[in-house]
């Protein structure tokens, strides 16, 4: 819970400990942007993301992952969209760790946005939970710092519900037709209706021993990881050999992750859970 979209390739860093300011500056300089982009009006309240982050750190939230989009227009390098994944003190490590996903930019492409997510340590992969849990958006005006901190606690408050949903998915054994239906829907969402370069069977193939179970939660994670990380051998519409690409844009990551979560939730509801 990493990220091909219209924003292109990204700079990113993840550690199993809180990221330092030096690491953030090296990989995600837009976090430290010193002013709003020239295209923004006087009504735009400019607060560097690092100021927001330091306020969140005082509340016990620490960044473990950060990324920003690469841009062709170098004047936007310090204003481009970026993403931080934050964990609360006391929830820093574990098999599945809740994370607050913070999105922002200072070029007008994004307000402050916070989403609930889960980081799965065994595959170093992040999951974005669907919109059914809500999300927090804070526009760049007024008391931004206070509103973002309130938003972080609001997102923190939904993790009990996320865990309940995860437990329900883990308790549901999926029959083969349901597994195939979930994978087929995911393939069509990712690659379109006309041609899918890989098969349902490939998408359902586990990458490690821990993922051989056929409960809904594990099947969902297999599908998610195979789509997000790519690297699967396939065929183009013209029949040429190819490999699927990893999803490497912030918007693409969040959009696909949300859609997959909704598919898993719908499957859960279909079976009356």
Regions found by a protein language model. Give the residues of each.
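Intrinsically disordered, low-complexity regulatory segments
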Residues: 1-47, 54, 58, 75, ...
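Intrinsically disordered, low-complexity regions enriched in serine/threonine
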Residues: 1-12, 90-96, 102-273
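Histidine (H) residue identity feature
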Residues: 21, 27, 37, 79-82, ...
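Amphipathic, interaction-prone secondary-structure segments
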Residues: 46-111, 261
């Amino acid at each position: 819970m990493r990220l091909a979209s219209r924003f292109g390739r990204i700079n990113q860093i993840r550690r199993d400990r809180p990221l330092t300011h030096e690491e953030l500056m090296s990989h995600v300089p837009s976090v430290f942007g010193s002013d709003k982009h020239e295209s923004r009006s006087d009504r735009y309240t400019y607060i560097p993301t690092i100021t927001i982050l330091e306020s969140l750190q005082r509340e016990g939230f620490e960044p473990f992952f950060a990324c920003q989009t690469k841009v062709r227009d170098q004047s936007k390098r310090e204003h481009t969209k970026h993403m931080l994944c934050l964990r609360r003190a006391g929830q820093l490590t574990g098999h599945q760790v809740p994370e607050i996903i913070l999105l922002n930019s200072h070029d007008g492409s994004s307000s402050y946005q916070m989403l609930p997510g889960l980081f799965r340590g065994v595959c170093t992969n992040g999951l974005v939970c669907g919109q059914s849990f809500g999300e927090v958006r804070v526009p760049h005006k007024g008391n931004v710092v206070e509103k973002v901190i309130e938003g972080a606690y609001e997102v923190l408050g939904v993790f009990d519900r996320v865990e309940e949903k995860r437990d329900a998915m883990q308790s549901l054994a999926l029959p083969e037709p349901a597994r195939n239906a979930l994978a087929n829907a995911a393939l069509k969402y990712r690659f379109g209706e006309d041609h899918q370069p890989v098969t349902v069977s490939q998408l359902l193939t586990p990458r490690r021993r821990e993922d051989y179970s056929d409960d809904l939660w594990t099947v969902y994670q297999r599908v998610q990881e195979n789509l997000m990380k790519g690297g699967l051998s396939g065929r183009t519409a013209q029949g040429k050999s190819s490999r699927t690409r990893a999803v490497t844009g912030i918007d693409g990551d969040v959009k696909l992750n949300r859609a997959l979560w909704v598919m898993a939730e719908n499957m859960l509801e279909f079976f009356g859970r």
